[in-house]
Curated annotation (Swiss-Prot):
Catalytic activity: di-trans,octa-cis-undecaprenyl diphosphate + H2O = di-trans,octa-cis-undecaprenyl phosphate + phosphate + H(+)
Gene transcribed to yield this protein: uppP
Name of the protein described by the UniProt record: Undecaprenyl-diphosphatase
Transmembrane segments: 9-31, 46-66, 80-100, 102-122, 137-157, 180-200, 209-229, 240-260
Location of this chain's protein in the cell: Cell inner membrane
Misc. remarks from the entry: Bacitracin is thought to be involved in the inhibition of peptidoglycan synthesis by sequestering undecaprenyl diphosphate, thereby reducing the pool of lipid carrier available.
Cellular-component GO terms for this entry: plasma membrane
Gene Ontology MF terms: undecaprenyl-diphosphatase activity
Family: Belongs to the UppP family.
Length: 261
């Protein structure tokens, strides 16, 4: 616990809140930041608990923004459930592979940062001729395929959960804003399930003085995610996803420079 300071906890929470719902890979950013800060997240149980705390902060932001709408919209819940089923199946079947082999593979992260960025450039052009303006108009079979995209993202760090769901939505006919918004909503069951499973597999460890750092990171992620989600919808309406795609490709080069030399 002594390895992480208050300003590092704040910075990590802000980065989680900024990147969790953008199609840029929060895993890639946090891995790079842990490396730059010299924090051994794979060896420190408290840092693993800290990651759970900041992810919960980001999830809560979506719940606060969309909770009232979700409570009154059964059709939307149906689509979230349909998309979550293939995600859950893929995650359950391949969890040992994700944690034991793929997660932490720097070459995999760099490759998928670049690859998904390149495909996102193509998919963003398709959005100009989008067939569906609302996910509730999307056929359920296509909704399920968005869940497959999200499940595959869990297998390959650097893909980005939000990047995969947005990419899937665009390729399956959603416009930019509908794809982004459904990505936010699909994060609710997906991230709660992932966080819950991680907590079940390994009990959180919080040494004396650690709760204040967890709270700081949690609040930083919450506030930043609240701002980011609102900003992103307005941004993609004007500029599309091309800036994010180019950013991913540039980040892949930076990541490769630090980790693959």
């Amino acid at each position: 616990m002594g390895r992480v300071s208050a300003w590092e906890a704040l910075l990590l929470g802000v980065v989680e809140g900024l990147t969790e719902f953008l199609p840029v890979s929060s895993t890639g950013h946090l891995t790079l930041l842990f490396h730059l800060l010299g924090l051994p997240v794979e060896e420190d149980p408290f840092l693993k608990t800290f990651l759970v705390a900041i992810q919960l902060g980001a999830i809560l932001a979506v719940l606060l923004l969309y909770g009232r709408r979700l409570a009154a919209d059964r059709a939307l819940w149906l689509r979230i459930a349909v998309a979550f089923v293939p995600t859950g199946v893929i995650g359950f079947l391949f969890y040992p592979l994700i944690k034991g082999v793929i997660l932490g593979n720097d070459a995999v992260v760099a490759f998928f940062l670049f690859f998904v960025g390149a495909v996102l450039l193509f998919a963003d052009r398709l959005a100009e001729r989008a067939q569906y303006q609302d996910v509730k108009a999307l056929p359920l079979a296509r909704v399920a395929w968005i869940g497959v995209f999200q499940g595959l993202a869990a297998l390959f760090p650097g893909t980005s959960r939000s990047g995969a769901t947005i990419l899937g939505g665009l390729l399956l006919g959603l416009n930019r804003q509908a794809a982004a918004e459904f990505s936010f909503l699909l994060a609710l069951p997906t991230m709660f399930a992932a966080v819950g499973y991680d907590l079940w597999k390994s009990a959180p460890e919080v040494p004396e003085g650690g709760w204040s750092l967890l709270l700081l990171g949690f609040l930083a992620a919450l506030v930043t995610a609240l701002v980011t989600v609102r900003w992103m919808l307005a941004f993609v309406a004007r500029h599309g996803f091309r800036p994010f795609a180019l950013y991913r490709m540039a980040l892949a080069a930076v990541y490769a420079f630090f980790f693959l030399r």
